[in-house]
């Protein structure tokens, strides 16, 4: 609803009058809770032919996650050895579980460290093994926000699907605080966000 309202305000500024949208017929279904502890199949309708999950999970690296968050990751990944996995990888694990019986796509704004070091095989190994590919990605950029106390992190955006077409798309940031530039890609983007096989 908020995005719809903002778009209506922009339209009103451009043409002088917003569209008649009352009574409001579009409503959001907001669920309050820990997304990693909720059963997503209870929240997202099974009747959908495709489900799209995307978001901006918390930016917590391995050094800043709590004991409880580390246990959540162990439970989600089904292993005691989560090593340096960032907390955000829990959302990837939830998607792998959720999409075992459904079709769809998922994408997250995450800490850039998921594409570096020992996180790469721990995160991307299970994703690729389950038949997912990187459909699009934005390489490292500096997070910016108008919010007070904003996070000072470097991020990537990675989107996944199980389709072979279209060709994947990749963007780079020549200036880490600037605008993205498209990068030519062949048949695949690998876990390090470069053109090449996994």
Tell me the role of every PLM-derived stretch.
Residues 1-20, 24-25, 35-198:
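Signature of N6-adenine DNA methyltransferases within the class I
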């Amino acid at each position: 609803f908020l995005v719809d309202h903002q778009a209506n305000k922009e339209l009103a500024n451009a043409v002088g009058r917003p569209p008649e949208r009352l009574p409001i017929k579009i409503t959001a279904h907001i669920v309050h809770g820990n997304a990693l502890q909720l059963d997503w199949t209870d929240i997202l309708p099974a009747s959908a032919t495709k489900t799209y999950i995307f978001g901006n999970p918390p930016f917590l690296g391995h050094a800043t996650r709590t004991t409880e968050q580390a246990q959540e990751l162990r439970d989600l990944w089904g292993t005691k050895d989560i090593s340096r996995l960032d907390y955000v990888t829990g959302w990837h694990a939830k998607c792998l579980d959720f999409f075992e019986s459904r079709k769809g796509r998922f994408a997250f704004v995450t800490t850039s460290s998921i594409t570096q070091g020992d996180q790469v095989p721990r995160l991307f190994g299970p994703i690729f093994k389950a038949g997912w590919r990187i459909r699009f990605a934005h390489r490292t950029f500096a997070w910016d926000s108008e919010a007070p106390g904003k996070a000072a992190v470097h991020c990537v955006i990675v989107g996944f699907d199980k389709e072979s077409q279209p060709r994947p798309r990749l963007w780079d940031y020549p200036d880490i605080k600037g605008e993205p530039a498209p990068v030519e890609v062949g048949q695949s983007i690998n876990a390090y966000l470069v053109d090449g096989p996994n």
